[in-house]
């Protein structure tokens, strides 16, 4: 399990860097470039979806060439380029280009990193392993957000955004240095010379494919987190306090990720996933109708609980029910399907907000989450597989 901690530390430093700037993006777009919620949603949707198309191919290359560490390193290295692109951006189009670069890196690194976590886990403890990784990942996010908050809070105005973009390069570099500690499991290259990866996907258990469709359905209502930040600002929080709320969310998810992973090892992944979808529905209904600041803080805490229940547990579930020789491909396929859904999700959310007001995208997301929970529950009753068949 030691390798899991090293992989987690790579994500820890990378997320300090990323989350120093991520919650600032919607605020920066609105304040500096006059972007509307619809435009912000479109930018986030394009960035997430275009990059996510790479995830399944990245997973396929991981399975074929067994060069997980090299592929993951190249993805994390893209984070440095992203920060430089933010510094140089002179319009909302420049921010869009930077976000696409960032998400391309995530698309490249996600599948090989998750395979390394899965392979490094103690038998029977995949949930715990992914929980440890997610906990370190979210801890880095929380620290990055806190650093951004402190710089903005104690700054004198003017150039704090640019200052944060520059400082974020430091932890991005540290994440790359941590790769020297990771030991990759040596495997023989799998010879799949001319066979398209989707041909293997066709042979998978139909219930596994149905689960991926459930994830797609859920994601259509799970728009970018920037809408949570914009919603918090709409009820009266200033920019620095909005960032602090995002810190609370990440800190909560970090603290609860390992207990959630351990819980899934004991009671099963599917039960926790259904419960997570239900928590999400409660949170989104809350974001739709709550106007009191104190209750908004509670919602960010509950959103952290949802993330802890879903993120690591879902990856552990996919890695366990996928055939061993297609583990990277399936993790990548899942990420791609989710990413493709993010473009319409964020675009729909932006349009709903603009046309019908702030509550509309959250009601839409909550309803789709309830539907996804129902479908997943019915799949469980039908015997959704717990382990893979090769």
Predicted segments with their positions:
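Cytoplasmic helix-loop-helix junction between adjacent transmembrane helices
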Residues: 98-139, 317
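Helix-loop boundary and gating motifs at the non-cytosolic
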Residues: 1-51, 207-245
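Glycine-rich segments within core transmembrane alpha-helices of 12-TM secondary carriers
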Residues: 131-148, 335-345
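Structural signature of the two symmetry-related core transmembrane helices
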Residues: 70-84, 169, 271-286, 366
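Transmembrane alpha-helix termini and helix-breaking/packing motifs in multi-pass membrane transporters
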Residues: 27-32, 143-160, 344-360
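Helix-to-loop junctions at the C-terminal end of transmembrane segments
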Residues: 54-66, 152, 256-268, 353
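Juxtamembrane intracellular "pre-TM" segments in multi-pass secondary transporters
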Residues: 1, 184-214
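C-terminal membrane-cytosol helix-exit motif in multi-pass small-molecule transporters
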Residues: 169-189, 372-380
């Amino acid at each position: 399990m030691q390798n899991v901690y090293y992989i987690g530390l790579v994500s820890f430093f990378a997320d300090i860097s990323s989350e120093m700037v991520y919650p600032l993006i919607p605020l920066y777009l609105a304040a500096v470039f006059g972007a509307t919620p619809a435009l912000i949603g479109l930018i986030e949707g394009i960035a997430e979806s275009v990059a996510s198309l790479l995830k399944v191919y990245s997973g396929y290359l991981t399975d074929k060439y067994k060069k997980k560490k090299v592929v993951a390193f190249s993805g994390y290295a893209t984070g440095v380029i992203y920060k430089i692109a933010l510094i140089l951006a002179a319009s909302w189009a420049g921010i869009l280009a930077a976000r696409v670069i960032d998400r391309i890196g995530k698309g490249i690194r996600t599948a090989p990193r998750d395979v390394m976590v899965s392979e490094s886990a103690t038998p029977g403890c995949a949930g715990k392993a992914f929980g440890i990784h997610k906990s370190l990942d979210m801890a880095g996010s929380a620290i990055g957000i806190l650093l951004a908050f402190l710089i903005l809070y104690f700054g004198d105005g003017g150039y704090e955004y640019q200052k944060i973009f520059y400082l974020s390069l430091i932890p991005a570099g540290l994440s790359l240095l941590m790769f020297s500690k990771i030991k990759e499991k040596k495997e023989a290259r799998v010879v799949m010379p001319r066979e398209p990866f989707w041909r293997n996907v066709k042979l998978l258990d139909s219930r596994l494919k149905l689960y991926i469709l459930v994830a797609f359905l859920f994601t259509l209502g799970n728009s970018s987190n920037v809408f949570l930040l914009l919603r918090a600002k709409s009820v009266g929080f200033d920019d620095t306090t909005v960032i602090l709320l995002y810190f609370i969310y990440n800190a909560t998810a970090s603290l609860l990720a390992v207990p959630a992973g351990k819980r899934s090892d004991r009671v099963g992944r599917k039960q926790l996933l259904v419960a997570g979808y239900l928590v999400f529905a409660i949170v989104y209904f809350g974001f739709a109708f709550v106007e009191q600041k104190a209750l908004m803080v509670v919602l960010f805490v509950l959103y952290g609980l949802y993330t802890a229940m879903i993120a690591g547990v879902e990856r552990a579930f996919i890695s366990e029910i996928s055939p061993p020789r297609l583990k990277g491909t399936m993790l990548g396929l899942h990420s791609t399907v989710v990413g493709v859904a993010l473009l319409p999700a964020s675009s729909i959310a932006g349009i709903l907000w603009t046309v019908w007001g702030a509550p509309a995208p959250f009601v839409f997301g909550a309803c789709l989450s309830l539907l996804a929970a129902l479908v997943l529950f019915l799949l469980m009753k039908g015997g959704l597989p717990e382990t893979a068949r090769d």
